[in-house]
Regions:
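Extended, hydrophobic alpha-helical segments
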Residues: 1-34, 38, 42, 46-47
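Intrinsically disordered, low-complexity boundary segments flanking structured domains
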Residues: 25-28, 52-57, 80-82
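Short, intrinsically disordered low-complexity segments
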Residues: 35-65, 70-72
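Terminal, non-globular segments
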Residues: 58-61, 65, 79-91, 95-96
Length: 96
């Protein structure tokens, strides 16, 4: 299923900047960045639960926030993009 993950991490402190880097790094491991602090991830249920747990452990819920939008498996008709797209589609294979 496609899961859209967005986050807002308070970066006023060094600890906040560290949390921001950690959240972004985890999201990169599971999907692709489509905008600052916005990732598209193709996940199964187990991966979704695991990533949510990892990210929740990183953030400070007093000053940071996470949002998860579960768009399901039929997401191609639910996503519209306008403008420059600088990457592969989230479901395309990249061979290195």
């Amino acid at each position: 299923m496609l899961v859209l993950i967005t986050y807002d991490v308070n970066t006023e402190t060094a600890a906040g900047r560290s949390r921001l880097r950690k959240v972004a790094k985890q999201c990169v491991n599971y999907g692709r960045r489509v905008q600052n602090s916005v990732f598209e991830c193709i996940l199964d249920n187990a991966q979704s639960v695991l990533l949510k747990s990892i990210l929740t452990d990183i953030i400070d819920e007093e000053v940071d926030s996470l949002r998860f939008y579960y768009l399901g498996n039929n997401y191609k008709t639910k996503v519209e993009h306008i403008g420059v797209d600088r990457g592969l589609a989230v479901d395309q294979t990249l061979i290195l």
